[in-house]
From Swiss-Prot:
Residues 86-99 have a biased composition (Basic residues). Transmembrane segments: none annotated. Its main location: nucleus. Component of the 90S pre-ribosome involved in the maturation of rRNAs. Required for early cleavages of the pre-RNAs in the 40S ribosomal subunit maturation pathway. It comes from Clavispora lusitaniae (strain ATCC 42720). This is rRNA biogenesis protein RRP36. Keywords: Coiled coil, Nucleus, Ribonucleoprotein, Ribosome biogenesis, rRNA processing.
C-alpha cells in the first residue's frame, strides 16, 4: 500500500509569518512539516523561539546564588562585628575593678608631670599667681613691696578695732554663738600678730639701714677707713634693745617673765640629765 505524503497547503493570500506561527504553535506535528519552509522562514522562526525562551526563562541560578551569598556575607559581617562588640563589652566589664590600675593609650607619650585624680595639679596652683612675685622674674624686693603696700596696715588696724568693738558690745555678743565669738577672737589675734611681725621687721630693717648710714658718714669724714659690718648676734642685740625701748611697761614685764621661765626650764633639763658625782 503506497503512502502519499501530503505537504501542508496554505493560501497565497496568507503571509509567510502567519503560516510560520501556525507551524510553531502546532507542537504535535512531525519534523516533516518544517521541510516545506524556506531558510529565511526557519531563521526567523529560530529568532522567535529564542526571544520566547528568553522572556519565559526563570532568573539564573548564578544571580540568585550571588544574591544569597551577598546576603549571607552581610549577615555574617554584621554577626562578626556584633560578636566583636559583645566580646569587647564583656572584656571591659570583666576587667573593671576597684583595685585595677588606670588605663592609658599607648599612642600618646606619657607626660613628665602625671596628673593624679584627687591631687592638685600644677596648672591649678599656677593659675592665679601674681607675676610680680614670680621666681622667674628674680627675688622680690621686700623693702620696696613693704613701702608700696604700707597703706594696708591702716586697713588692718581699722579691722581689728571694729572686731574688738563687736566683742565688747554685749547686745551683739548675745546674738552670736560661742563658736562665732571664738572665731572672731582668733581673727583678732592673728591680725594683731601679723601687724606686730611687720612692725618688728620694719624696725630691724631701719636699725640696719641706720647703722650703714652712720658707717658711710664716718668714712666720708675720715674717722673710719673701712665700714664695720654687724654680725648676726650683734644685730639681734640691737633689735632687741630697740624693741624694749618702744614697748610699754606691761609688755616688758610679760617678755621678761617669758624669758625667765624659759631659762628655768633649760636649767631643770640640765639638772635632770647631769650624772651624779661619786
Amino acid at each position: 500500500m503506497s503512502t502519499h505524503r501530503f505537504k501542508p497547503s496554505y493560501d497565497e493570500s496568507e503571509s509567510e509569518d502567519d503560516y510560520l506561527g501556525s507551524v510553531l504553535d502546532n507542537k504535535d506535528e512531525s519534523d516533516d512539516d518544517f521541510s516545506s519552509l524556506s531558510f529565511g522562514a526557519l531563521n526567523s522562526a529560530q529568532k522567535k523561539l529564542r526571544e520566547q525562551s528568553e522572556t519565559q526563562r526563570p532568573p539564573s541560578r548564578k544571580s540568585s546564588k550571588n544574591q544569597e551569598s551577598d546576603d549571607s556575607d552581610s549577615d555574617s559581617d554584621d554577626q562578626f562585628f556584633e560578636d566583636k562588640k559583645s566580646k569587647k563589652t564583656k572584656d571591659k566589664k570583666s576587667k573593671r575593678s576597684k583595685h585595677a590600675p588606670a588605663e592609658a593609650s599607648f599612642k600618646r607619650p606619657v607626660p613628665k608631670i602625671r596628673e593624679i585624680p584627687g591631687l592638685k595639679s600644677a596648672k591649678d596652683s599656677t593659675l592665679y599667681t601674681d607675676i610680680r612675685f614670680d621666681a622667674a622674674y628674680g627675688k622680690a624686693d621686700l623693702n620696696r613691696v613693704r613701702k608700696d603696700y604700707a597703706f594696708l596696715d591702716e586697713l588692718r588696724q581699722k579691722e581689728i578695732a571694729e572686731m574688738k568693738a563687736v566683742l565688747k558690745n554685749d547686745k551683739l555678743r548675745r546674738k552670736m554663738s560661742q563658736r562665732e565669738i571664738e572665731d572672731l577672737e582668733l581673727q583678732v589675734k592673728s591680725l594683731q600678730s601679723r601687724l606686730d611681725t611687720l612692725k618688728n621687721r620694719d624696725l630691724s630693717t631701719k636699725i640696719i639701714s641706720d647703722h650703714k648710714k652712720q658707717q658711710m658718714e664716718k668714712m666720708k669724714k675720715g674717722e673710719q677707713v673701712n665700714p664695720y659690718y654687724l654680725k648676726k648676734s650683734e644685730q639681734r642685740k640691737m633689735i632687741q634693745k630697740a624693741k624694749f625701748e618702744t614697748m610699754k611697761a606691761s609688755q616688758r614685764e610679760k617678755v621678761m617673765e617669758r624669758k625667765r621661765k624659759r631659762k628655768l626650764g633649760r636649767e631643770f633639763r640640765q639638772l635632770e640629765f647631769r650624772e651624779p658625782q661619786r
